[in-house]
C-alpha cells in the first residue's frame, strides 16, 4: 500500500 501510495503520489505530483 505504501509503495502504491508513494508511486501514485509521485505521478500526481509530477503531473
UniProtKB/Swiss-Prot annotation:
Induction annotation: Overexpressed in acid environments.
Superkingdom as given in the UniProt entry: Bacteria
Protein name: Acid shock protein 1
Organism of derivation: Fructilactobacillus sanfranciscensis (Lactobacillus sanfranciscensis)
Amino acid at each position: 500500500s505504501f509503495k502504491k501510495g508513494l508511486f501514485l503520489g509521485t505521478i500526481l505530483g509530477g503531473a
